């Protein structure tokens, strides 16, 4: 990941027999600097598809990882630490969602926002453990200040694909979030929503692939933006024809 000055940061997870460690390094003009540890734990959910990430800008850094919360295979929480540059120290770890339900929470995207805040978007499975019948995976987002305090939080979509990555980018007019939706007919196409003047737009399909699949393909979209230009890439396989759109 890079900050607005073009400095490149790399984060990764290493494991031994006892614990997992999240660390990062910054690329200097000569080499990668000495790795620095963000957090360690012996109860993390470590997975190839849903993994920790680092967000960096001039005001500091934010890092997240996934921590097992109960006995279910996919019962895990999103944990995060914040590094305000003016304090030059990591905050205590906190859980970014406040539902308190042991369910799947993950597939996070993080984006530097206004005045040192961070926009964090994630898949939230609280409704899959509640209601009769049980609900669906939801898409939620929140704004967090430099200390990690929650400033705002929203449900962006009440029914989305269960385990596809989310992605976000900052445009000239504000943030855009893209993700894989899930209709009642099991059509799982890519949708987008934008935060404009404090309100999220109604999610809309980027393209009507009409890919109907009764299961999660574990393959979300990726978005990038520069000024008013936005580019999104994603995988689709309607009629068993795989392609990148």
Predicted feature locations:
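Extracellular, repeat-based ectodomains that mediate carbohydrate processing or recognition
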Residues: 1-245
């Amino acid at each position: 990941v890079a900050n607005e000055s073009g400095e490149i940061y790399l984060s990764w997870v290493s494991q031994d027999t006892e614990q997992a460690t999240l660390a990062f390094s910054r690329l200097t003009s000569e080499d990668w600097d000495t790795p620095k540890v963000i957090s360690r734990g012996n109860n993390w959910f470590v997975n190839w598809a849903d993994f920790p990430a680092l967000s960096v800008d001039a005001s500091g850094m934010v890092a997240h990882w996934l921590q097992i919360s109960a006995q279910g295979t996919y019962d895990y929480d999103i944990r995060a630490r914040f590094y305000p540059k003016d304090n030059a120290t990591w905050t205590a770890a906190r859980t970014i969602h406040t539902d308190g339900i042991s369910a799947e929470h993950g597939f996070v995207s993080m984006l530097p926002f206004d005045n040192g805040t961070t926009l964090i978007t994630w898949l939230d499975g609280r409704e899959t453990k509640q209601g009769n019948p049980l609900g669906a995976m939801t898409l939620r987002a929140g704004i967090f200040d430099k200390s990690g305090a929650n400033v705002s939080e929203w449900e962006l979509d009440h029914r989305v694909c269960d385990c596809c990555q989310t992605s976000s980018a900052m445009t000239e007019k504000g943030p855009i979030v893209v993700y894989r939706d899930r209709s009642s007919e099991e059509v799982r196409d890519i949708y987008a929503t934008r935060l404009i003047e404090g309100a999220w737009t109604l999610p809309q399909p980027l393209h009507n692939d009409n890919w109907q699949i009764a299961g999660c393909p574990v393959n979300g979209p990726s978005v990038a933006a520069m000024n008013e230009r936005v580019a999104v890439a994603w995988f689709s396989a309607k009629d068993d024809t795989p392609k990148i759109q």
